[in-house]
Curated annotation (Swiss-Prot):
This is Thioredoxin domain-containing protein 9. Its main location: cytoplasm. GO terms for cellular component: centrosome; cytoplasm; midbody; nucleus. GO terms for biological process: microtubule cytoskeleton organization. Residues 52-180 form the Thioredoxin domain. Pfam families: Thioredoxin. Keywords: Cytoplasm, Cytoskeleton, Nucleus, Phosphoprotein.
Length: 226
C-alpha cells in the first residue's frame, strides 16, 4: 500500500511539473506571436534582413573553416605543420599518436565523427616518432594525448582515457563533453553532467600542463596493447 501511494504521489508531482513546463512554453510562444502580430511591414522586413544577414555570415564562416582544413580529421607530417595549422585556426585538437598503441585507433574513430560535427574546431593527428622536439616541449609522455590549442596556445591536454571514464568503450559524446569542458568546441549539453555513468568513481579532475613531467625519452602507453 505504502509503495503504491509513493508511486501515485511521484506521478502527480511529475505530472504537475510537466504541466507547468508546458504552460511556460505556451506563454513564451504566445508572447513571440504577439510581438510578430504587432510589427508593421517595415519592422518585419528589417527582421527578415537581419536573419538573412546572420545566415550569410554563418555560411561565410563555414566556408572559411573548410578552406583551412576544418570538417575533416587529418594527419600532418611534421612539427612545422603543427605550428602553421595552429596559426590558421582559433581552436585546434591535435592527437599525438603512435601506430603500435591500440588506444590511438579508438580515439581516431571518435575524432573522425567530431571533426565533421564541429566545424568550428580543427582536428589533427601527429605521429610522435616524427615530432620529438614538440613532444618534449609540450611534455607529452603518455600516448595517446590530445593537445587542445586555442588562439595559438596550448590550453589543456586529454591524457589517456582517465578523463573519459577510464574505459576503452567510452562514447563519442563523452569525448565531446570533455573537449567542451576546455571550450575547444561548442558543446550544447550540460558540462556539469558527464555522459559516462562512473563520474563519482573517476571524478572530473583533468590533466593539466603543469602536472606533466619528463622522465626520459621513451613514451609510455596508456593502453595495455603495446
Amino acid at each position: 500500500m505504502e509503495a503504491n501511494a509513493s508511486v501515485d504521489m511521484f506521478s502527480k508531482v511529475l505530472e504537475n511539473q510537466l504541466l507547468q513546463t508546458t504552460k511556460l512554453v505556451e506563454e513564451h510562444l504566445d508572447s513571440e506571436i504577439q510581438k510578430l502580430d504587432q510589427m508593421d511591414e517595415d519592422e518585419l522586413e528589417r527582421l527578415k534582413e537581419k536573419r538573412l544577414e546572420a545566415l550569410k555570415k554563418a555560411q561565410q564562416q563555414k566556408q572559411e573553416w573548410l578552406s583551412k582544413g576544418h570538417g575533416e580529421y587529418r594527419e600532418i607530417p611534421s612539427e612545422r605543420d603543427f605550428f602553421q595549422e595552429d596559426k590558421e585556426s582559433k581552436k585546434v585538437v591535435c592527437h599525438f599518436y603512435r601506430d603500435s598503441t591500440f588506444r590511438c585507433k579508438i580515439l581516431d574513430r571518435h575524432l573522425v565523427i567530431l571533426s565533421k560535427k564541429h566545424l568550428e574546431t580543427k582536428f589533427l593527428k601527429l605521429n610522435v616518432e616524427k615530432a620529438p622536439f614538440l613532444c618534449e616541449r609540450l611534455r607529452i609522455k603518455v600516448i595517446p594525448t590530445l593537445a587542445l590549442v586555442k588562439d595559438g596556445k596550448t590550453q589543456d591536454f586529454v591524457v589517456g582515457f582517465s578523463d573519459l571514464g577510464n574505459t576503452d568503450d567510452f562514447t563519442t559524446e563523452t569525448l565531446e563533453w570533455r573537449l567542451g569542458c576546455s571550450d575547444i568546441l561548442n558543446y550544447s549539453g550540460n558540462l556539469m553532467e558527464p555522459p559516462f555513468q562512473s563520474q563519482k568513481k573517476f571524478g572530473t579532475n583533468f590533466t593539466k600542463l603543469e602536472k606533466k613531467t619528463i622522465r626520459g625519452k621513451k613514451y609510455d602507453s596508456d593502453s595495455d596493447d603495446d
